[in-house]
Amino acid sequence: MFDTDTISRFQQIETPFYYYDLGLLRQTLEACKTASDKYGFHVHYAMKANFNPKVLEAVQSYGFGADCVSGNEVTTAIANGFDKSKVVFAGVGKSDKEINIALDADIFCFNVESVQELNIINDLAKAKNKTARVAIRINPNVDAHTHHFITTGLDENKFGINSWQLNDVAETLRSCKNLQFVGIHFHIGSQITDMEVYRSLCIRINEMQQWFEDRGFQVKVLNTGGGLGVDYHNPDTNNIPDFESYFKVFKDFLHIKPGQEVHFELGRALVAQSAALVSRVLYVKMGQKKNFLILDAGMTELIRPMLYQAYQKIENLSRKSEDRSQKSESESQISNLKCQILKYDVVGPICESTDCFQKDVELPESFRGDIFAIRTAGAYGEVMASRYNLRDAIQSVYSE
Ligand code: LLP
């Protein structure tokens, strides 16, 4: 991702900024498209992961749909070229204003998360003399002892409709004349790398599909949600997720009926590896107990490490040639003569103790002005940035 030319280019640019490798993004999208096309699967990009216009432009150019979670995302998706017939709208708290935006835009469907929401969408559609297509988001409520997907799938989660409410759902769907039932929707969590979890999801989807069919509903769409994870530890050697194995699980374990569509809502897997947060060292504080590298980026630019204790690889690009992790043992012995490897807490400038990207990171001895990259920052990075401390809005730089 960072050749010498790119690193010298960074030296001329004010930091911090997000760097997007658009070539890698396209390769990732291509890999996903090829793997999903093989089975005729439909992918909606979960644009909450990143709605940078250049990212949206690339994603939509491959013909993916958009999975939106606000009225603004619906409007932005369509304004950026996504086909409205491939836009879905999820979220536990859709406001009337947002539902109206989506009705006016004639999107493909609402992923509905409560019985009350079904009634509201029906009323608003009726007022416009329209029919709203709806899919029911089901909370799988799976016992953690037998299945792995506990992240969003239990009764105490706010997401989705619990199975004990499904009779109400069926009744409401029958009585609401301005709703058209298209299918069932699930989303069990994010950063899932164990394919066994998806196998368990398939079993649950099959059961739910049967439940609806037994009651006379035709399930045209099976929407499995998103969640495919990426390798945060190896952003160079494992930068494109294994889409083939992922889709194959669904091909093998879902009971797909003739004419039925299978939908996916991938966010992170499509965009995470294609960007890094680039920052400079402002100050180096060498202490008796701790050494601190104080960067000019902090939790305001990338909050995942602070909010979720998430690991994102940190590299000193200015001393990349000296980085022991990039070299063979003999090479690193030679370079260790020149450069020391030290442990640092890599922190930001924000007035919060939690503003720390990672503690005790082993790095080549680093100096004021060194350029750092925090890798795998393309998903839930730029979009979660804030202006706290009245920081400048974060800028973006793109590969040529
Ligand atoms: N569909 C639904 C209904 C979702 O709630 C999400 C993500 C996705 C699809 C896309 O999931 P993905 O493929 O990106 O895993 N900010 C957190 C992640 C929050 C995910 C929220 N929902 C993070 O930085 O790890």
Give the positions of each predicted feature.
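Arg/Gly-rich low-complexity intrinsically disordered repeat tracts
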Residues: S321-Q340
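Charged (often Lys/Glu-rich) extended helix/loop segments that serve as interaction or gating elements
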Residues: T4, Q260-K320, K338-E400
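Short beta-strand segments
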Residues: A46, R133-N139, H185-H187, N223-G225, ...
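Conserved beta-strand positions in the central sheet of alpha/beta enzyme cores
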Residues: D67-C68, N111, A135, H185, ...
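Short acidic, glycine/serine/threonine-rich loops at helix termini
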Residues: L56, A79, I99-D104, I121-L124, ...
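A charged N-terminal "starter" segment
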Residues: M1-A132, E171, C176-Q180, Q210-F217, ...
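Active-site loop/helix belt of alpha/beta enzymes
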Residues: N141-Y283, N389
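Flexible loop/turn segments at secondary-structure boundaries
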Residues: F51-K54, T75-T76, D143-A144, S190-D194, ...
